[in-house]
Amino acid sequence: MIYVTIPLKYIPRQLTWEMVIKNIEIVDKGNTYDTRTFCRESITGFKPAAYNEIFVINALKRFNESTAFMQKDDMQELYSSYSIRKKSGGYRRIDNPCSDLKQAQNRLKDIFEDFFLARYHTCAYAYIPKRNIVMCRQKHAANHSKWFLYTDFSNFFGSITYEYVIKMLSQIFPFNSILANPTGNAELKKALKLCFLNGGLPQGSPISPMLTNLIMIPIDYQINKYVCQNFKRASYTRYADDICISSIDGFDYKEVISHINEILKSEGAPFGFNDKKTHYMNNNWKNFNLGIMINKDGNMTIGWRKKKELKTLLHSFIMSHDDSNKCIWELRDVQYLQGIIAYYKQIEPQGIANIIDLYNKKFHCNIQWQIKQALKI
């Protein structure tokens, strides 16, 4: 089967493959974050005007010629590695490519996005322009879901091998077409070798997130199809390795896990579920995921702990002004407060506005104006 994912300026309610073939102009590379994926045995007749196979192969040739000096048996010397502490405990290894390699990986990423029309399944939300955590959670809130299954994949980036990426790309247009061309096959495979470290995708590389979203298209498609066909008003999202499936009615989550495992097995996926992070609950409990809670009323909220922390920050900021109403906070601290307020307003606009209004009245001040003044310094 071949998977074709197209970005659209608009998505007709009943978009069919026949409509795509007859009206190829609806395939657009404009400013949009919605996509539609089709799974077909044959894609005869599908020839987007923006795609030119010879042009793409030549671009890969030029890329490989200019980066030949970085093709090494031991890629580790082109990376600096360090570890950061995870909130859940333990450490996450970060492999940061050197400037030349990072520049090369960004160039290859641009080739994939510009020439290959590389896209993501519409249920993916991480590392995608115009998509974010808030939109990911909003999809479930807008669905008025009551029951939620949360899980994630273990060692997601590190387990994705070079061989697995090639295998999955052979199912995805237009990579399948390039791989079917002898010259294109050699050039694409050579270029992709610059993206791997110690047998997996390094966290810290600018191209790793895009590659994971790309190769997950067949899996995302199958999971979403299963969820939508088998549960009443259900919703599926994936944020990197974090999975959420929700519905207005309860469901047998073990059956869902079992079916998804079958999908992963059929695709030869080298990763699987993290049982310790698999939870099934309704929204009467602490329904937190990705730092955002969906409460019993179906509304998104930052939760009382973060509200308490915000109030502490606001109080500290107000008290930091001297007699001349000048803020003595460091610039970076003011920027942090401004960013926190902006982010929280995306999640819970009215609730955050109420907190700020409360403190403005309580301390006879204008917090937003004070922040703007502090940032001018």
Roles of regions detected by a PLM:
Residues 234-238:
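Short beta-strand
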Residues 241-248:
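Short beta-strand->loop micro-motif that forms the acidic, two-metal-ion catalytic signature
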Residues 1-85, 91-205, 209-210, 214-228, ...:
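Right-hand nucleic-acid polymerase module
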Residues 230-232:
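Short helix-terminating capping/connector loops at secondary-structure junctions
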Residues 153, 240-241:
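Short acidic donor-binding/metal-coordinating loop in glycosyltransferase active sites
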